[in-house]
Design a protein with these regions (language model features):
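Glycoside hydrolase catalytic-domain context in secreted enzymes
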Residues: 26-433
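Bacterial Sec-dependent N-terminal signal peptides
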Residues: 1-32
């Protein structure tokens, strides 16, 4: 019988191996101890309000310049205008209380301007080298406008065809998903996060999001612990070992506990068993949605439970901003939890080299959607094609055929050729059949 006690013994035995890998992981920066010392000095200077500000992510649609200037925002989501990003970073480093740069985040799922096949198509190539190269293209293009963090790859295992986000996944197999996820992480983060064309990756959605009951998005998932460890956690563990910079908790609940308040997943497994020290971010307003789950009474309760469980940064909702100071002052939340979360966030910013180079020089990057990038995208698309059945030997087509009719309402729609989850492409760059 599989039980937590047995697992605890197992992980204690292999813990030195995991710790060694963490120490020599491919993106572990030189001078890690020096970075920790810098974080110590910075934390000692910061007020509680300053620290809470680092834990808050706001939407770029709000363009909250005053909040950035006041040090009340640690990250901006969905900002893509390079001039506005530059203005935000200048405010953060030149006018905020401690000059801490911003994490600029964007969903760069299968390309930024140059669009590659959807993740399910990427998995169908079985070509990790090509996937890594494509992810590097996406990172370079995104970094050229000032983005330094993306919410991908998604590594949710789904075996229910009714689930609506399968296109964003690498499919139903945990081994293939692990291989593809690691390839994308290496492409996005390069071998050194301080490189100008590297951005932080994000392993999402932790964990079991694709196993929702009835294939319904956001639905709760019931997963026996053995299945959780042998299937659903595998890609995340591989990503942690590969040095992924961040991880996103899911909207859903696992075995009755929402992911954004699940200390067994976020503290026991992620932090203690795996010894991972990256940033854990909530999904969009998922901390406040703990109320909708029926798990929390109000925003104050949600902020308390989320931080205790291990959420470092709150995406878009404002429960941390509104209630954490009160919770710490009343003794309901230990200040050490706040310091730990902020340490993780500051470490990522140091690892990205943002304190040294917060403002991007677009001239150092290749042209977006250049010929080489397009050739790579086309090569990936060709390799992603899967033939399930060749009825009556229809393929290969005769060389004597001169014209082929492509029929359907979307056959000549340039946007629909791009697949789901694309935001920043130029439609004129899209080529229909």
């Amino acid at each position: 019988m599989f039980n937590r006690k047995g697992c605890s013994v197992k992980f204690k035995l292999i813990f030195p191996t995991l710790l060694l890998f963490h120490t020599v992981g491919f993106n572990m920066p030189n001078g890690a101890n020096e970075i920790e010392s810098k974080i110590d000095r910075l934390l000692n200077k910061m007020s509680l309000q300053d620290k809470i500000g680092q834990m808050c992510q706001r939407s770029g649609a709000d363009w909250n310049y005053d909040g950035v200037k006041a040090g009340k925002i640690g990250s901006i989501l969905n900002a893509v205008d390079p001039e506005k990003i530059k203005k935000l970073q200048k405010l953060a480093v030149e006018e905020s209380p401690h000059g801490i740069p911003l994490l600029i985040a964007r969903d760069v799922i299968h390309g930024f301007r140059t669009i590659f096949p959807i993740p399910l198509g990427l998995a169908a190539t079985w070509n990790t080298e090509l996937i890594e190269q494509g992810a590097h293209v996406a990172a370079s293009e995104a970094a050229s406008v000032g983005i330094n963090w993306t919410f991908g790859p998604m590594m949710d295992i789904s075996r229910d065809p009714r689930w609506g986000r399968i296109a964003e996944s690498f499919g139903e197999d945990h081994y293939l998903t692990s291989q593809m996820a690691v390839a994308m992480i290496k492409g996005l983060q390069s071998d050194d996060l301080t490189k100008p064309d590297a951005i932080a990756a994000c392993a999402k959605h932790f964990v079991g999001y694709g196993a929702g009951e009835g294939g319904r998005d956001y639905n709760t998932a019931y997963i026996p612990e053995q299945l959780l460890r042998e299937v659903y956690l595998k890609p995340f563990h591989a990503s942690a070992e590969a040095g992924v910079g961040t991880l996103m908790a899911g909207f859903h609940g696992v075995n009755g506990i929402p992911s954004s308040a699940n200390s067994f997943l976020l503290r026991n497994i992620l932090r203690q068993e795996w010894d991972w020290n990256g940033v854990v971010v909530s999904d969009w307003a998922s901390i406040h949605e703990l109320i909708e789950h029926g798990y929390c009474a109000d925003g104050k309760d949600a902020a308390q439970k989320a931080l205790i469980a291990g959420i470092d940064m709150e995406m878009t909702s404002t429960d941390y901003e509104e209630y954490l100071q009160e919770l710490v002052n009343s003794g309901e939340v230990d200040i050490k939890l706040v310091d730990g979360a902020v340490r993780n966030i500051l470490r990522l910013k140091f690892n990205l080299g943002l304190f040294e180079n917060p403002i991007v020089n677009a001239d150092q990057f290749p042209k977006m959607v250049n010929e080489d990038y397009l050739k790579m995208a086309k090569k990936t698309a060709i390799q992603s094609v899967v033939m399930l059945k060749n009825g009556k030997n229809s393929l290969p087509l005769s060389k004597n055929i001169k014209n082929i009719a492509v029929i359907g309402p979307l056959s000549d729609d340039p946007f629909e050729q791009l697949g789901t989850w694309t935001f920043d492409q130029n439609i004129e760059d899209s080529q229909t059949p």
